[in-house]
Amino acid sequence: MGPTALTFYRAAKRLQALPRLANMVATVGDRLHNSHVDTKAVLHPTVELGYGGIGVIIAPGVEIGAKSFISQNVSLEPLPGRVGVPRVGRDVYIGVGAQVLGPVVIGDGAKIGANAIVLDDVAPGTTVAGIPARELKQKVPPTGT
């Protein structure tokens, strides 16, 4: 399949001691994939991007936890007029075209539907969808005795 947006992100992160080269590598990745994964974002090594990260925008400061999957054309960015960026937990699925905006926290195991616009926190294990995103289903934790 060739290099993905994550390949260029990781290479640029490793080259940060050489800022001009890191910037050049990041720019090539951005242009090839019509995306931008900022090197100031923190992505766990097990994060995956759908279709190589085509159209994905991940702003500086965004944190994405282990085993999370970000589909193509997803935006994780600040909301104009509000301070802060999204934080995505572990094992989160974000569907095609979704936008997660502002200082929201996406809990572990949450699922975000295609084209959803998330403006509020999403509880762990919750499925949300719609514009604006609203809860569709919440995973019931097992009860122990």
Q: Which residue stretches match the model-derived regions?
A:
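Terminal amphipathic alpha-helical/low-complexity segments used for targeting or macromolecular assembly
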Residues: 1-35, 133, 140-145
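Left-handed beta-helix
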Residues: 39, 44-45, 50-51, 59-60, ...
